[in-house]
Structure formats: structure tokens, C-alpha cells
Amino acid sequence: MPSYFSRAAAPAAPLICTGDHAQVRAQIDGYRAAFEHLIQVEAIPRGFRWIFRAQPGLGALLCALAEREADCCRFMSFDVTDDGARIVWESTGDASASPIIDEIARLPERLRDEPRASHDLAALKRSAEAAGLVFTAATERS
């Protein structure tokens, strides 16, 4: 499969998110747009796989989302590939990141359950923190 994006996890990277409020909101908005084309979510060893119906421009969107995630969440590996009919996103990490990775895997469901354009970033942040993710920048408006 041709690869759009691939980056391995950084060894011993801390379980942190460096995104600020605007970055996190933009990322969530990007996911919301991408998930309109999501056809399947699969658990894989140490991570998850999101499978999308290929659409014009979707590969570029997913590549940009994965690159921003890889810059922020260095404890995870990201691979986005294309087989022509489908675009596949895989994310994995080591056991210490498992609860966080599981939480991220549920993002399509969480955003589907929260269909408002002004989705509740604070609720998403609380879920990620409960899974063990530490935010190093303010993601909630004061």
C-alpha cells in the first residue's frame, strides 16, 4: 500500500499533549470532517486502525492530522496508507500508553455522540486526562 505518512514513536517519550486550545479545536474539527468517511474501526495489537472510504482530498487531510498528532503525541506511532479504495490510519504505542490510545480510538464515537460544531473540548480533555494524558498547554479558554 502506498504510504501517505509514517512516523514511529519516540523511545521513552512522555505521555503528554502539547497542543493549545486553538490547535486542539482545529484538530478536532479536522477529525470531524474525516470521520464523515470512516467505515470501520478495528483494535490491533497495541493500538487501533481507522479505515476510511477514499475520497478526493481525504488522504491529504488525514496526513496533516497524523503529522500534527505525531508532533504532539510523540509516544505513539502513526501510519496512514492508501490502497486505492480505502485509506487506513494505524496508531500504536507501548503498554504505558494503552489507556490513552484506547481513548483516542474512541474519538469517532465520541464526536458522533456530540454532533454540535461547538463540541465540548473540556469533556474530551477530561476523558484523555482520566486515561493518563498530561496536557502541557491550556486547551480550555479561561
For the regions a language model picked out, list residue spans one by one.
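Short, solvent-exposed amphipathic alpha-helical segments in soluble enzyme
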Residues: L65-E69
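Secretory/periplasmic and organellar redox-cofactor proteins
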Residues: M1-A64, S77-S142
